[in-house]
Amino acid sequence: MPSAEVLQETPRVVISVGKKKTAVARAIIKPGIGRVRINGYPLELWPIEMARIKMSEPLILAGELAKKVDIDVNVSGGGYMGQAVAVRIAMARGLVAFFQSQELKELYERYDPYMLKGDPRRTEHKKPGIKHARSKRQKAYR
């Protein structure tokens, strides 16, 4: 876990963005007591357990540092898991920027390379003349 030593010139507020497919999350990180709210709801009360676990990964990895900030996240678009991954990316980027910690950044990159970079995959668009992106009529050569 990263040490709790913080640089003297920590920013007062950090705004970070995370994206996954069409889900976009904007996180506002400020000094506090460890409160995390997603669209106004506390993270502990989030209804979907898998999404809650995915969103709490950056906080668990940060350890004691996460208890020194309050995080407010607004997320929209996509499905519930896409939103969870977008929140996770926004929180991880924001914590690294807030504490300006190279150690925390390396910890996140070792745990999951996509926690800071994001996932570049997007949905392939539908082509004209066929029902879906790649589906075609079956051919029979008899």
UniProtKB/Swiss-Prot annotation:
Residues 117-142 are annotated as: Disordered. InterPro entries: Ribosomal_Su5_D2-typ_SF, Ribosomal_uS9, Ribosomal_uS9_archaeal, Ribosomal_uS9_CS, Ribsml_uS5_D2-typ_fold_subgr. GO terms for biological process: maturation of SSU-rRNA from tricistronic rRNA transcript (SSU-rRNA, 5.8S rRNA, LSU-rRNA); translation. The keyword Ion transport does not apply. Pfam families: Ribosomal_S9 (PF00380). Gene3D superfamilies: 3.30.230.10. Keywords: Ribonucleoprotein, Ribosomal protein. It comes from the Archaea. GO terms for molecular function: RNA binding; structural constituent of ribosome. HAMAP family: Ribosomal_uS9_A (MF_00532_A). Belongs to the universal ribosomal protein uS9 family. This is Small ribosomal subunit protein uS9. It comes from Pyrobaculum aerophilum (strain ATCC 51768 / DSM 7523 / JCM 9630 / CIP 104966 / NBRC 100827 / IM2).
